[in-house]
From Swiss-Prot:
Function: Catalyzes the condensation of pantoate with beta-alanine in an ATP-dependent reaction via a pantoyl-adenylate intermediate.
Nucleotide-binding listed as a keyword: yes
Subcellular location: Cytoplasm
Amino acids binding (R)-pantoate: 65, 158
Enzyme Commission code: 6.3.2.1
UniProt keyword terms in alphabetical order: ATP-binding, Cytoplasm, Ligase, Nucleotide-binding, Pantothenate biosynthesis
Full protein name: Pantothenate synthetase
Stored InterPro entries: Cyt_trans-like (IPR004821), Pantoate_ligase (IPR003721), Pantoate_ligase_C (IPR042176), Rossmann-like_a/b/a_fold (IPR014729)
Binding site for beta-alanine: 65
A single GO BP: pantothenate biosynthetic process
Annotated catalytic residues: 41
């Protein structure tokens, strides 16, 4: 029978729980989440268990990474179900602060990064996003002091930005990217998939199929530009409104025009109805 994890909602409670976990020099892994947990999140937890003695999962819907017109108010909040899933995975500690705990009255600081990985892609369409992400992740690292932190590769640009921030600020956290977990039809698992209607859900895997087609063309010797154009046509013809479909250097996320320039990562973001989906694959 699974043992329920400790749930901390205040900083003193978190510090007490972490001190208990760290007895006998136990290593700690952090899995930052916004809740609404699915199998993709649980795969991060399982990787965390392989990389550290103790596992902490944060469940916090971070308001600073949402613009006023975005879905902060409607973002799914399912803490009871989340806690049950984490208990089944034998997570040691859940950090579930209120917004007022994370951002108390008078809070006026922000962590920003000017890393090349920030430029374009998500930053072009959600310019508020990375300032909110780096600030909350920086706070989580400082609060929890993990040895390692696990992030999903579905948010590939975020993974690169957080990795750079942790290194630049000497936070002492090894950031590990976990593989994207997909549904059987290829759709990347996401908490926002619940927004899709049945008709939209049937169309959604087109994003993944289009990226695979782009990768196939590039490997066959077609130019990156023509391959991206073909992929974009597949996406828009399926009914998406495309934000971007780009080829970037897999490490730096600099724009890339030829396979000779280095390893390629394809990244895509598009709206299907009211739902915005992102995904990426290696070439």
């Amino acid at each position: 029978m699974s043992r329920p994890p400790v749930v901390a909602r205040t900083l003193p409670a978190l510090r007490r729980a972490l001190a208990e976990l760290r007895k006998r020099n136990a290593s700690v892994a952090l899995v930052p989440t916004m809740g609404a947990l699915h199998d993709g999140h649980l795969s991060l937890v399982r990787l965390a268990k392989r990389r550290a003695d103790k596992v902490v999962v944060s469940v916090f819907v971070n308001p600073t990474q949402f613009a006023p017109h975005e879905d902060f108010g409607s973002y799914p909040r399912t803490f009871k179900a989340d806690a049950s899933k984490l208990a089944e995975e034998n997570v040691d500690l859940i950090w579930n602060p209120d917004v007022k705990v994370m951002y108390p009255e008078g809070f006026a600081s922000k962590i920003l990064t000017e890393a090349p990985a920030v430029a374009g892609l998500e930053d072009s369409f959600r310019p508020h996003f990375f300032g909110g992400v780096t600030t909350v992740v920086g706070k989580l690292f400082i609060q929890c002091r993990p040895d390692v932190a696990i992030f999903g590769s579905k948010d590939f640009q975020q993974l690169r930005v957080v990795t750079r921030m942790a290194a630049d600020l000497d936070l002492g956290v090894k950031v590990i990217g976990a593989p994207t977990v997909r549904e059987r039809d290829g759709l990347a698992m996401s908490s926002r998939n619940v927004y899709l209607s049945a008709e939209e859900r049937a169309i959604a895997p087109t994003l993944y199929r289009a990226m695979k087609e782009v990768a196939k063309r590039i490997k066959a010797g077609k130019t990156i530009a023509s391959s991206l154009t073909a992929g974009a046509e597949l996406i828009t013809e399926a009914g998406f409104v495309l934000d971007y479909l780009e080829a970037r250097h897999a490490e730096t996320l600099a724009p890339i025009k030829s396979p000779k320039e280095g390893p390629i990562r394809l990244l895509v973001a598009a709206k299907l109805g009211k739902t915005r989906l992102i995904d990426n694959i290696a070439v």
